[in-house]
């Protein structure tokens, strides 16, 4: 797509597992000319920056340095990964009050130096914190984006691809709603080469067993809990998901991604941030699509949204 705006500078707030890995994926991408890493632990950020810079001879030129909030000035995109970590057995919603308080300071500091960037929220619970960011920042709704279910959708497509033995990039399926326990698998639209998933399984003769919708859905929904149980945190795949969103913005691709953003009547939901198929380009949210999900999926999506709205009511924002 034509892109009259050149995006050069990205700031990452938070130099933990997700933030530093995100900086790494952006460094490898060749998309950005300047990456700033901000963290309350300056020593940790310095170490990450040093480690990244030692790989500079292997990538396209990019300036990477540890900064302060004043370095948000001039940033085209500010990615927020900072916040309390999710503990084993803790749901993303359990995190909300702790991270809302953290965000009050972060958003205030960002907008003090930059009120014209795109804010990309990654910290969990991402949908609620995307809404919190929208409210606290005063930014236009198209400039506040959550990573949403981009990762969940990738997990869904990967698991389906493993089952049917097809390249994951050729599996078309979405996880919508909350990035968390009430997320919805949109089976009605899942397809390979335009062939509905169930029909494809009947015709391809590659599947070793009949596809179990519930098994795959539960694997997607519980993936983060299993990874945290095994290694303590998730960061590789989510960093790649963030890179994909940044890529869509930088290249003005008008890509369709399941990012989280403010709904205003779509699917019968308002005043809540949720993930549905959305066109993402240089302006951030270009358009929220009206996708023909079936009635059950719409009802589950509304239930997901209303669950989050009840939690939002308890927050001091």
Swiss-Prot record:
Catalytic activity reported: (S)-lactate + NAD(+) = pyruvate + NADH + H(+)
Enzyme Commission (EC) number: 1.1.1.27
Record PTM Phosphotyrosine, positions in chain: 225
Biological process (GO), any one: glycolytic process
Binding sites annotated in the UniProt record for substrate: 86, 92, 124-127, 152-155, 234
Principal location: cytoplasm
Protein family per UniProt: Belongs to the LDH/MDH superfamily. LDH family.
Assembly mode: Homotetramer.
Entry protein name: L-lactate dehydrogenase
Species in which this protein is naturally found: Acetivibrio thermocellus (strain ATCC 27405 / DSM 1237 / JCM 9322 / NBRC 103400 / NCIMB 10682 / NRRL B-4536 / VPI 7372)
Gene: ldh
């Amino acid at each position: 797509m034509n892109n009259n705006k050149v995006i050069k500078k990205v700031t990452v707030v938070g130099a933990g597992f997700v933030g530093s890995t995100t900086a790494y994926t952006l460094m490898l991408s060749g998309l950005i000319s300047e990456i700033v890493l901000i963290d309350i632990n300056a020593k940790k950020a310095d170490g990450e920056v040093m480690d990244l810079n030692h790989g500079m001879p292997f990538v396209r030129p990019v300036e990477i340095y540890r900064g302060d909030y004043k370095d948000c000035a001039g940033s085209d995109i500010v990615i927020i990964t900072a916040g309390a970590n999710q503990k084993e057995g803790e749901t993303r919603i359990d995190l909300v009050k702790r991270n809302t308080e953290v965000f009050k300071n972060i958003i205030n500091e960002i907008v003090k130096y930059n009120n014209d960037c795109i804010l990309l929220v990654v910290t969990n619970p991402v949908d609620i914190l995307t809404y919190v960011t929208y409210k606290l920042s005063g930014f236009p709704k198209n400039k506040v984006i959550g990573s949403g279910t981009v990762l969940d959708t990738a997990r869904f497509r990967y698991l389906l691809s493993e089952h049917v033995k097809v390249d994951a990039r050729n599996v078309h399926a979405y996880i919508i709603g909350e990035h968390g326990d009430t997320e919805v698998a949109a089976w009605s639209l899942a397809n390979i080469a335009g062939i509905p998933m169930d029909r494809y399984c009947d015709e391809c003769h590659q599947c070793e067993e009949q596809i179990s919708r519930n098994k795959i859905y539960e694997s997607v929904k519980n993936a983060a809990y299993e990874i945290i149980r095994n290694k303590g945190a998730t960061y590789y795949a989510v960093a790649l998901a963030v890179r994909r969103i940044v890529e869509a913005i930088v290249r003005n691709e008008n890509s369709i991604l399941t990012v989280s953003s403010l709904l205003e009547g779509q699917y019968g939901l308002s005043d809540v941030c949720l993930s549905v198929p959305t066109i993402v380009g240089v302006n951030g949210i270009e358009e929220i699509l009206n996708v023909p999900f079936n009635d059950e999926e719409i009802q589950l999506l509304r239930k997901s949204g209303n669950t989050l709205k009840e939690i939002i009511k308890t927050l001091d924002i």
